[in-house]
Amino acid sequence: MADRVAIVGAGLAGCLLATLLARRGIEVTVYERRDDPRVAGPERGRSINLAISARGLQALDQVGLRELSLSRALPMHGRMVHAPTGGQSFRPYSADGAHAINSISRTELNMALLEDSERARGVCLRFAHRLRELDMTTGELWFETPDGPRQAAADIVLACDGAYSAARRSVTFQMGFTFSQDYLEHGSKELAIPPRNGQFALDPDALHIWPRGAEMMIALPNLDRSFTCTLFWTGEAFAALRTPAEIVARFREDYPDVVDLIPELADDHLHNPIGSLATIRCWPWVHHGAGCTLALVGDAAHAIVPFFGQGANCAFEDCVEIDHCLDETAGDWTAALAAYQQRRKANCDAIADMALDNFTEMRDRVNSPVFRASTAARHFLERRLPGRYVSRYELVSFTTMPYAQIPARMRRQDRATALAAAGLTGAAGLLAAVFRAGARHGAARRGAAAGTDQ
C-alpha cells in the first residue's frame, strides 16, 4: 500500500512541495489552518514582500512557475539608500549592474503556488484545519475546524507550517531533540506608499533603505505602483509613539522624504501589527515514530530573519532537495529524508548567520564611507577577475552555490585580495624608496658639481 502523505501548511513551501510530490505520482493531503486565501484575502499588515532570486527561481522552474512568477514581480537592480537629509544614493547589487532580485507579493506568489498544487493530480487541500495534535505512535492528526474536531492519519507528515510549527510541538520534548529560538530586540511593522498620480512615488528599480544606525526602514515596489514599506524598530521605539502627532513628528525628523508619501502613516503605524524577528534552529529535522515519520521543512526547521531576502528561497531549496533525494533513493522515504536533513542543515545554519550579519550592514554599515569604498573595491575586483572574485551578496542571491560553502569562499578571496593589496603596497613603497634614493643621489651629484665649478 502506498504511503499516506500529509503536508501541514499551505504556504509557499507546502504548496511547492505538494506539487513536486504529485508530479512523482504521490497522493498528498495538505492541511492549512487559515481559510482559503483566495476567498478570505490577506491579513492586514502581514505581507512583507519577498525578494525572489536565483535559488527560488530555480525551484519555481521545477514546477513550471518561473516565468509566471517573474511576470508578477518587479526587478530591483540595487539598493537606493536614503539619507536623513533626504538625499539618495543608488548602490548596484552586482559589478555590471545587470543582476536583480525580484520583488513579489507573498500573497501573489502563494496564490500561484496554491492554484498550481490544486491543479496537480493527487493533491487534496483542506482549509480551516488547525492542527492540535500529532500522535507519532499512531500517525493520527487531530484538527480543529469550524465544523468541530476532525481526525486524519498519515504515514509521512511533512511540517511546512512555519516558525511556530504546530507539528514540531509533537517532538519538542523528545529526548535528543535540540531547539533554540533567538529573538532580535527589533520587530517589524508594515506601511504603504500608494501610487502618486498613477505612477511610482519612488524609483521602482531599487530596494529602498533608510538606514538609521539602530533601526531602519525598507520599501519594495509592487505591480500596482505602490510600495510596501517595513519598519525594523525596537519594541521600545514602537511603544514610544502613541499619538498621530508623535508619529508624524518622529518621521519628519528621521524619515523626512516619506512623510508626504504615506497618507495613512499614523493609522497604519497605530493599527498594523508588530511582527517578531527570530532565528530558530533545531535538530534533528526527521523523527520516526511507531505510527508515522515527521520531517520539518522550511521555517519549521530553520526560521531566519529576512535581511538577506532568503527565507522563501531557502525553503524552496528544501523542497527541491526532498524531491532530489526521493529520486536518488527510488522513493524510499526513510533514506530520502535522512539524506535531506544531512545535506540541508549546514546550509541553513550558514544563511541564518549571514542574514543576521546583513541586518547590521543594512541598518548601519551601509552608511559608512569605509563600507562604500570596500564595496567599490569588490566590484572593481569582480570586473577585473570575473568568476574568480565574487561578492558574498552575489554568491547568495545570484548563484545556487550551497550557502555553507560561501563563508569559506569569502575567507579565501579576502586572503587573496589582502595579499594582493600588500604586494601592491610593498611595490609602491619600493618604488617610492628607489625614487627617494635616486633623488638624493642626484642632489649629491649636483652639489658636488657645483663645488667643482666654484
Residue ranges and their predicted role:
Residues 10-23, 158, 191, 275-361:
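Conserved mid-domain beta->alpha element of the FAD-binding
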Residues 13, 36, 164:
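Conserved Rossmann-like nucleotide-cofactor binding loop
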Residues 40-116:
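Active-site-adjacent segment of FAD-dependent monooxygenases/related oxidoreductases
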Residues 324-453:
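C-terminal helical "tail/cap" subdomain of flavin- and related membrane-associated enzymes
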